[in-house]
Regions:
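Non-heme Fe(II) oxygenase catalytic core, chiefly the N-lobe of the double-stranded beta-helix
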Residues: 2-163
Length: 163
């Protein structure tokens, strides 16, 4: 496994790894990089949905969206994802049900349930098909906060996001 820091200074690029056979130590390193650098990019993987769940579970608990034996027809669930993977965007509408976040236009902004105190700290995105030309952008709020001047930090220090 080779690790390179992107020119932005906070994205790790990992090459020379097959996630299906990655050791627990390698997965722990990937998890540590995600916590440290916010975004980890690993390209050229050929994972089936069950492989994705296995890889993610080496990092930590995966959200159980629906019971593992739930039929995927007519849902946003991905076949073989054991009730833990949802389709994002369009494409194959299982029983007329589109994936989450299917939009004709760009989604300007969203985040991982910021109003939920116990939200899962990691989001896994895996482009399977029809992702050519799409773009996902990330912001590092830790660096954004660190870049604020001390006066503004003092003004906002007691702000809380209501649930």
């Amino acid at each position: 496994m080779k690790i390179q820091l992107h020119k932005n200074g906070w994205t790790s690029i990992i090459t020379d790894i097959d996630l299906r056979s990655a050791s627990q130590q390698e997965m722990n390193t990937i998890a540590w990089l995600a916590a440290k650098d916010t975004v980890v990019v690993i390209r050229n993987q050929h994972l089936l949905p069950g492989d994705e769940v296995d890889v993610c579970e080496k990092i930590g608990a995966c959200e159980q969206v629906m019971p593992p034996d739930t039929p995927t027809q007519g849902t946003k669930l991905v076949e073989g994802g054991r009730g833990k993977i949802v389709r994002v965007g369009g494409g194959n509408h299982h029983g007329g049900v589109a994936g989450v976040f299917e939009h004709v236009s760009d989604m300007d902004w969203h985040s991982n349930r910021t109003g939920t105190e116990t939200r899962d700290p990691l989001i896994w995105l895996y482009g399977v098909k029809d992702s050519q030309g799409s773009r996902t952008s990330w912001i590092n709020n830790i660096l954004s906060y660190q870049d604020l001047d001390q006066e503004l930090k003092e003004q906002i220090k007691d702000l809380n996001l209501p649930n």
